[in-house]
UniProtKB/Swiss-Prot annotation:
GO terms for cellular component: nucleus; tRNA methyltransferase complex. One of its GO terms (molecular function) is tRNA (guanine(46)-N7)-methyltransferase activity. Pfam families: Methyltransf_4. It comes from the Eukaryota. It catalyses: guanosine(46) in tRNA + S-adenosyl-L-methionine = N(7)-methylguanosine(46) in tRNA + S-adenosyl-L-homocysteine. Keywords: Methyltransferase, Nucleus, RNA-binding, S-adenosyl-L-methionine, Transferase, tRNA processing, tRNA-binding. PROSITE patterns: SAM_MT_TRMB. It is found in: Nucleus. This is tRNA (guanine-N(7)-)-methyltransferase. Its EC number is 2.1.1.33. It comes from Drosophila grimshawi (Hawaiian fruit fly). Belongs to the class I-like SAM-binding methyltransferase superfamily. TrmB family. InterPro entries: SAM-dependent_MTases_sf, Trm8_euk, tRNA_(Gua-N-7)_MeTrfase_Trmb. Pathway: tRNA modification; N(7)-methylguanine-tRNA biosynthesis.
Length: 247
């Protein structure tokens, strides 16, 4: 089998035991300022996105339907790929080294599973979802969006930086199809209350009932699949979950 350049680069930082990249080569601050003028390459419109470079096995009828916003080190993204092998999932991460880690992690997983074509349905891009989401997705394209353990921006002056706010909720509604779901999880109760307040006040969302939330097959995976979620479990912290439907 011929490996591509990204797979070859990933091998230089991988563990000899697991065959996966090691986080110690990708350390970075826990959060990044989403308002700062980072340097990003981004498409002018969704039609300009080269999805085939991210999903080598994509066919002409397929499109990305799941988006993990602020995907961190990719633990939950990998879980999505395993749970929904016929769906394309994208992770969007603003931090350079962290997004590099996820890209290398996916390359290593694809290489390890080259005989089964597993993990061909997940990918990660470095971008600022608070600014460029409509550049990547068409109207009503997405079925599910995930906001797991977002930066709480504790200071009141920085609340405007929170990834859930009234203006951005309208953008999310634009790229979400009717009936699509927004999954939110945090270990900060104040942020959870903020999210619930803003989303229930927005006319295009309704919160799922407790019964519907528990019945969703993704719900159990939200607690420990991501690295941040697993850390909260280890520290015996609280999880605050809310799922909303696009109406």
């Amino acid at each position: 089998m011929v490996t591509n350049k990204k797979e070859d680069e990933a091998l230089s930082t991988t563990s000899a035991v697991t065959g996966l990249p090691q986080k110690r080569f990708y350390r970075q601050r826990a959060h990044s300022n989403p308002i700062a003028d980072h340097s990003f390459d981004y498409p002018a419109r969704p039609e300009d996105v080269d999805w085939r470079s991210l999903y080598p096995s994509i066919n002409d009828e397929q499109q990305v339907e799941f988006a993990d916003i602020g995907c961190g080190y990719g633990g939950f993204l990998v879980t999505l790929g395993e749970m929904y092998p016929k769906k394309l999932s994208i992770g969007m991460e603003i931090r350079v080294k962290v997004s590099d880690y996820v890209v290398d992690r996916i390359a290593a997983l694809r290489l390890k599973n080259s005989e089964t074509a597993a993990y061909q349905n997940i990918a990660c891009i470095r971008t600022n979802a608070m600014k460029y989401l409509p550049n990547y997705f068409r109207k009503s394209q997405l079925e599910k969006m995930f906001f797991l353990y977002p930066d709480p921006h504790f200071k009141r002056a920085k609340h405007k930086w929170r990834i859930i706010n009234q203006a951005l909720l309208s953008e999310y509604a634009y790229v979400l199809r009717t009936g699509g779901l927004v999954y939110t999880m945090t270990d900060v109760e104040d942020l959870h209350k903020w999210i619930v307040s803003h989303m229930t006040q927005h006319p295009l969302y309704e919160r799922l009932s407790d019964e519907a939330t528990k019945a969703d097959p993704i719900t159990p995976k939200l607690y420990q699949s991501s690295e941040e979620g697993a850390k909260v479990v280890r520290n015996k912290g609280d999880h605050f979950l809310a799922i909303f439907r696009r109406i």
